[in-house]
Amino acid sequence: MAKPILLSISLCLVALVNGCLAQSGGRQQPRFGECKLKRLVALEPSNRIEAEAGVIESWDPNNQQFQCAGVAVVRRTIEPNGLLLPQYSNAPQLLYIVKGRGITGVLFPGCPETFEESQQGQSRIRPSLRSASFQRDRHQKIRHFREGDVIAFPAGVAHWCYNDGDTPVVAVALMDTTNNANQLDQNPRNFYLAGNPDDEFRPQGQQEYEQHRRQQQHQQRHGEPGQQQRGSGNNVFSGFDADFLADAFNVDTETARRLQSENDHRRSIVRVEGRQLQVIRPRWSREEQEREERKERERERESESERRQSRRGGRDDNGLEETICTLRLRENIGDPSRADIYTEEAGRISTANSHTLPVLRWLQLSAERGALYSDALYVPHWNLNAHSVVYALRGRAEVQVVDNFGQTVFDDELREGQLLTIPQNFAVVKRARNEGFEWVSFKTNENAMVSPLAGRTSAIRALPEEVLANALQIPREDARRLKFNRQESTLVRSRPSSSRSSRSERRAEV
């Protein structure tokens, strides 16, 4: 009897986990009318918070462009020796490292603490702290990151970041607030496990009012007889009674109150005191790190091949073949040698999707990293199955976007530090200025697909000559030239144009 019961329990657990993972994928539909965009604008951050060891800048999530795409975006600058406090959010995040290097920890619930201190490390602890009951430190895996990395953070999973380099870390993060993993609302929310941070997406004036209101409530509670003391901080422990926390952690009440960070004014990025942050981690050179990344990708390809074989054999994929605790969360798309598309005189494009980074199947997000050389052109194209949020990394580009009515909804310059949302199916073209143009695009599909309008792999090339000639009312010779004159597929070298310079002059006058 025991075996059938155990089998039944196992099947129930597999079905439950499979259902949970299935629920985490997919996106909610935006409210009706939110994508009726008559004009797009290249946006700068609208909110800025200065912390002890860095700066947090965010774009207004209520802007119609972000409401259409169902996303929120924040840019963080972490100074050397700066620590972004542990936090989790109500929506999955995809983060791109613009500059710098550092380490991060992602805290999956129930996963073992596989990084632990040695006896030698314990001997370095001050004698006053050593005792028979003293525990060696151990924690979950530490991951290194560097410029060009895409990092995936699932919804509700806590994480932290630390800058162990000599230059600031600049990171841009997109939160997919319409993902089914978010069952609250479309407002981006960060839940901190420490400190007294501000709401990154709320204007400063509103934050000051909210902080004043919390302080008044805190003072009123202190004056009420029999009222348990609660902190006035802004992390998840602040609202609990200190006595409850003391019981939960088995510590004294004073230590429990420190969790509430009542008088901490450092905000969400703090400076590590003294020397660098001391955590348990392997010391790798860049070459060793890249070698380990290649091994991880090879293991994932083997796992993916096994999954395909199991599905052909009639077995369902329950999402557990790659253990959650060992998920690879990072992929570098900034390295030129990693390019998926390359044209010698025009530029390159690299992508991260669920084929190259399987965790993105869970997040339902992907990313594109592009570089256009001076005056090069990314041919007109559209995204078949995703919105695209473009962040300009370096340089400038002339960008045009056209909607389903054939109306130009954006015809302007996109500069370093700006964001532009390109809705699904809207056609777009980019042309770099003299200094070139580099960007990263966050896309709201695990395998975002692009369809070019010109070039060797374009929709126009795929049409029969007769169809093209009759549709455009042109001779077949002209139709043939439209189909075959451009042999490149995606990135092309642009030819000089007097009309382009005159258009730029008119825009400058406006």
Curated annotation (Swiss-Prot):
User: Family per UniProt?
Assistant: Belongs to the 11S seed storage protein (globulins) family.
Keyword Aminoacyl-tRNA synthetase listed:
no
Function field: Seed storage protein.
Q: Name one GO biological process term.
A: seed maturation
Quote the protein name from its UniProt record. 11S globulin
Question: Which key words tag this protein in UniProt?
Answer: Allergen, Disulfide bond, Seed storage protein, Signal, Storage protein
Record's comment on post-translational modification: Proteolytically processed from a single precursor to produce an acidic and a basic chain that are linked by a disulfide bond.
Q: Basic and acidic residues: which segments have biased composition?
A: 284-318
Q: Name one GO molecular function term.
A: IgE binding
Q: Residue ranges of region Disordered?
A: 194-239, 284-319, 487-510
Q: Which cysteines are joined by disulfide bonds?
A: 35-68, 111-325
**What InterPro entries does the entry give?**
11S_seedstore_CS, 11S_seedstore_pln, Cupin_1, RmlC-like_jellyroll, RmlC_Cupin_sf, Seed_Storage-Functional
Alphabetical GO CC annotations of the entry are: extraorganismal space
Q: Which residues form the Cupin type-1 domain?
A: 38-257, 331-480
Q: Which domain of life is it from?
A: Eukaryota
Motif (NGXEET) spans which residues? Answer: 318-323
Q: Name one Pfam family in it.
A: Cupin_1
Quaternary structure, from the entry: Homohexamer. Can assemble in other multimeric configurations.
**UniProt note on tissues of expression:** Expressed in endosperm of the seed.
